[in-house]
């Protein structure tokens, strides 16, 4: 018998857990929905427990939550100044949600919701919508200064303005694709190496010896994926703070 390696893309399929339909609308509760809820619950419980008992000697959980708090707060202050701190709840929630979602997806048989482009695109659109809404609310038409750089010769100003507009509205695409592609590629690579190990072991004693290198690679890639999971949350947060600065200081 020939054994077929598991499909590495199968882990990203969306499956219905509870069928819900209203008219022609499919509102089914899927595995993606479940892990979105799980991510929110895990994040909330962790932050509640870590912040409920504040001692002079912080626990490990308290230290982690304080490090996350200081990271987001310092990044916002450096990017947008003191005025940017009003966005702290949004940025901290995004950072925590993405980080926990990435880590949850690393456990076997768990779903990585950040490997779904619609999830990452929704998060990116939330950021851009906040920038546009606050920009017009705070500065009115003056927010459009963002698309008109100072010091540009009048002759090429229309071209530069068009480039700035395209660059601004491409931000949610690049922001979402970066997170989506990194999580997707990493999990596919893990699945391929894991499937190769199983296939080699199925061959027999010779296959067991041949599976040692893929096993080492799988362990190394898993460790790397934990680093990538943090880095992607970090990058998303830093870019979010930079974009929010455009809403606070559109003329800079």
Swiss-Prot record:
Keywords, comma-separated and alphabetical: ATP synthesis, Cell inner membrane, Cell membrane, CF(0), Hydrogen ion transport, Ion transport, Membrane, Transmembrane, Transmembrane helix, Transport
PROSITE patterns registered for this protein in UniProt: ATPASE_A
InterPro entries (alphabetical): ATP_synth_F0_asu, ATP_synth_F0_asu_AS, ATP_synth_F0_asu_bact/mt, F0_ATP_A_sf
Example GO molecular function: proton-transporting ATP synthase activity, rotational mechanism
Topology versus the membrane: Multi-pass membrane protein
Intracellular or extracellular location(s): Cell inner membrane
Residues annotated as transmembrane: 29-49, 87-107, 117-137, 146-166, 196-216, 219-239
Keyword Ion transport: yes
GO cellular component, one term: proton-transporting ATP synthase complex
Keyword Ligase recorded: no
Oligomeric form and interacting partners: F-type ATPases have 2 components, CF(1) - the catalytic core - and CF(0) - the membrane proton channel. CF(1) has five subunits: alpha(3), beta(3), gamma(1), delta(1), epsilon(1). CF(0) has three main subunits: a(1), b(2) and c(9-12). The alpha and beta chains form an alternating ring which encloses part of the gamma chain. CF(1) is attached to CF(0) by a central stalk formed by the gamma and epsilon chains, while a peripheral stalk is formed by the delta and b chains.
Family: Belongs to the ATPase A chain family.
NCBIfam families: ATP_synt_6_or_A, PRK05815.2-4
Function: Key component of the proton channel; it plays a direct role in the translocation of protons across the membrane.
Record's protein name: ATP synthase subunit a
